[in-house]
Structure formats: structure tokens, C-alpha cells
Design a protein with these regions (language model features):
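Glycine-rich active-site/cofactor-binding loop and its immediate structural neighborhood
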Residues: 72-111, 116
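Short, conserved glycine- and acidic-residue-centered signature motifs
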Residues: 92, 286-289, 347
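Short, conserved beta-strand segments within well-ordered enzyme catalytic domains
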Residues: 49, 64-66, 75-79, 105-107, ...
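An N-cap/entry alpha-helix motif that binds or orients negatively charged groups
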Residues: 1-69, 175-235, 371-385
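Alpha/beta catalytic cores of nucleotide-metabolism and tRNA/nucleoside-modifying enzymes
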Residues: 1-46, 291-308, 312-385
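Alpha/beta enzyme core
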Residues: 83, 97, 118, 122, ...
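A gly/proline- and charged-residue-enriched helix-loop-helix capping module
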Residues: 101-122, 126-140
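Active-site-adjacent beta-strand anchor residues
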Residues: 31, 109, 130, 255, ...
Length: 385
């Protein structure tokens, strides 16, 4: 299969599987424990049916939305994710160039492999800096100060990762940063020489947001170790309220799953929340973001911008979430597999296909703008939600 033959998420995933060494593919593809929540994230959309209207005159369709005061050309964005230069040597640079062409939102992670200054200075799309709450309070402040100097518009604090999820695929392969593998994991690298050539013939792998604060040269640190040893499980609402005040700008919490927490986010002055279970990579057995979306929108949707991610593979998934009241919908694996498959060209094709699906499905729904979508367009198969 070639990139031009890729028509959907499954195709990008298959191309990525062929190109990547097994441990790296499984880092993207894997989730926590039995991966129940990971599967549930996508299955939740199948429990919801779309109800279209016809004869509405849909020659022109406007996909644009406003999110936390930022204008996006379409209601789908690329969620900030870690370690992207492991998947393709251009990493965040490739994603940023693709996103810039499509006028949507993207951001650098504190576990990103390109500096937030480089992305912020070279691209004009709405940019997010996604970070974690560390035990070192000085590090937290330094990250916010750095983001402010770089011109980042939205700070996004991930709040569902105070310790690492039990990602058993990574445990089996020995996946870590720097790479430290089991014998089986090393064999997986040996049979994917193209990836190795690209990885070792380009610039050194770095975590530029952390390298001034975290010494990883002395030994390998698994992602689970990073979450467990570096992040602060004592983080509470007072800590976050102080950070919101210090930032004095648009602040978003990623990983909100309950109505109570959504209301607290409003109370401390957040501009947005992302209803998310971290792609099923943290607490296995938790609900899907889509299943939680309606009650959270009902509680706070008129006071704060509610976004959602998790299991999004299709434009129809995005429309279902928008119909429930989400302002925009994010995804990680959707574009990461495309990045791994073909770099910038892969991400551009993934975003192109998503935009085509959104435009086509909007017309088939009888809607000319996102604001026309509502719960009148939905029916749920399950009687209990």
C-alpha cells in the first residue's frame, strides 16, 4: 500500500506498522492494561446514529469554529503528543507544516522533540503548549515562563497523568527513552533498517523542553518512570488555580471526565477543558470521552469551551461530538500513524481526508455550518447513558 492509497485511519495504521520497529509502533498503538478503554473510545461512537435533514441547500459548507477565542478553519485539531521524532525524523516540524496548511490547532508537548520556540516562531496557527505538573515547582514555573516568552497562546495542563498508566506492551518490549530494549525488542529494530537509518543519520534525539531540568544521559527512563518519578501525585485544585493565575491567559485542562471537575475548572478561571481519558493509556476501565461529553456540556458548556478527544477516526465521529456540544474534537493516533507512515505528506493526507469527510458529511446531514448541528441530529441505541 502507498500513501496515495490510504483512505482512512486503518490504512495509516497499517503503513505505520510496516515502517516502525515493533516497540515504537506499540508505544503509539498501545494503551493501559487490557486496553478496554482504548477500544471503548471508538466503539462509543457506534452506539450513536446520525439523523440527517434533506433539501436544505448545502452548496457551501463552513467548517470554521472558535475555540478559546482562536479561529480554526475546521473543528478537528491535532492533540499535542510526545516523542514525535521517534515516529518520523521530522517529528513536530512535519506536523506543524501540515497543520499550518489546514488552519487548525496544534501544540508542542513538554515531552516534545522540537522546541516550542521553534514551532511558535515559524507558524501562525493557534498554538498550545501541553505540559505536566512536576514535583519541582520551579520547573513548573520555568515551563510557563518559557511558553510566555515564546508567544504560546494556550497553556494546556494534563491532569490525568499524575502517575504512569500500566502500559503492558511497553513493559514487554522494554520501551524507554533513551531506547533500552529487551532481546525481542532489539530484533524488531533489526528487521526495520530504514527507520534506523533515518533515525541515526539525522539530528540527535532530544527532549528540548526538559533537557535543562532532567538528566536522561545517565540511563534510560521509561515513560512510566517519568510519570511516576517526576510528576507530582499531590497536585490539587489549589495548585492548578495558582498556575491559572500565574499564566494570566488562556488556560485549558486536559483529562477532565466528571461534571464536578468541569465545574471546578470553571470556578478557577479556565478558558477550556478537554474531556479525555488520555487515549485509554492511563486508567483502564474508565468511560469514553464521548460517553461523558453530554453531561459535562449540559453542566458547564455555557461557561467554558468543552473539547473532546479519544477514539476519533472519522469525520462522522467529529460531527457526533459537535452535535453533543463540543467546540472542537482532537486526536493523537490519527495523525501520528500518518506521520510515521510518510512524514509531512502523511499528515497532510490525513488532514485532507478528515476535511473531505467533514464537508461531505455536513452536506449529507443538511448542515451548512457547525452551529447547525445539535442533538436533534442524534439517536442513541443504548437506553442507559
Amino acid at each position: 500500500m502507498r500513501l496515495a492509497q490510504c483512505c482512512n485511519y486503518r490504512d495509516f495504521r497499517e503503513l505505520a506498522r510496516r515502517r516502525l520497529p515493533g516497540p515504537i509502533f506499540n508505544y503509539i498503538d498501545g494503551a493501559a492494561e487490557d486496553e478496554t478503554t482504548y477500544r471503548r473510545n471508538t466503539l462509543a461512537f457506534e452506539d450513536c446514529d446520525l439523523v440527517p435533514n434533506v433539501l436544505t441547500g448545502v452548496a457551501q459548507v463552513d467548517l470554521s469554529v472558535s475555540v478559546m477565542g482562536e479561529r480554526l478553519a475546521m473543528p478537528f485539531y491535532c492533540s499535542p503528543t510526545a516523542l514525535q521524532r521517534l515516529f518520523h525524523y521530522e517529528g513536530e516540524r512535519a506536523v506543524a507544516r501540515a497543520v499550518n496548511k489546514f488552519g487548525t490547532m496544534f501544540g508542542v508537548s513538554s515531552l516534545g522533540t522540537v522546541s516550542l520556540e521553534e514551532i511558535a516562531s515559524n507558524f501562525s496557527f493557534p498554538q498550545v503548549y501541553q505540559f505536566y505538573f512536576h514535583k519541582d515547582r520551579g520547573l513548573n514555573k520555568a515551563m510557563m515562563d518559557r511558553a510566555k516568552r515564546a508567544g504560546v497562546r494556550i497553556m494546556m495542563l494534563t491532569v490525568d497523568s499524575i502517575t504512569g498508566g500500566n502500559r503492558e506492551r511497553d513493559l514487554r518490549t522494554g520501551f524507554s527513552i533513551p531506547l533500552r530494549l529487551t532481546l525481542g525488542g532489539m530484533m524488531e529494530f533489526a528487521i526495520k533498517p530504514r527507520w534506523a537509518i533515518e533515525y541515526f543519520t539525522h539530528e540527535r534525539f532530544r527532549l528540548p523542553q526538559l533537557e535543562e531540568h532532567v538528566d536522561m544521559k545517565g540511563g534510560a527512563m521509561s515513560i512510566g518512570d517519568y510519570f511516576t518519578n517526576m510528576l507530582d501525585p499531590a497536585m490539587n485544585w489549589s495548585d492548578v488555580a495558582q498556575m491559572v493565575k500565574q499564566w494570566n491567559g488562556k488556560f485549558c485542562l486536559k483529562g477532565i471526565m466528571s461534571v464536578d471537575d468541569a465545574r471546578k475548572a470553571v470556578d478557577i478561571g479556565c478558558a477550556g477543558i478537554v474531556v479525555s481519558n488520555h487515549g485509554g493509556r492511563q486508567l483502564d476501565g474508565s468511560r469514553s470521552g464521548f460517553d461523558q461529553l453530554a453531561e459535562i456540556v449540559d453542566a458547564v458548556g455555557d461557561k467554558i469551551d468543552v473539547l473532546v478527544d479519544g477514539g476519533v477516526h472519522r469525520g462522522s465521529h467529529v460531527l457526533k461530538a459537535l452535535s453533543l456540544g463540543a467546540k472542537a474534537v482532537g486526536a493523537g493516533r490519527y495523525y501520528l500513524f500518518a506521520l510515521a507512515a510518510a512524514g509531512q505528506a502523511g499528515v497532510e493526507r490525513a488532514l485532507h481526508l478528515m476535511r473531505l469527510e467533514l464537508e461531505r458529511d455536513m452536506r449529507l446531514m443538511g448542515c451548512t455550518s457547525v452551529s447547525q448541528l445539535s442533538r436533534r441530529n442524534l439517536r442513541f441505541r443504548s437506553s442507559v447513558r
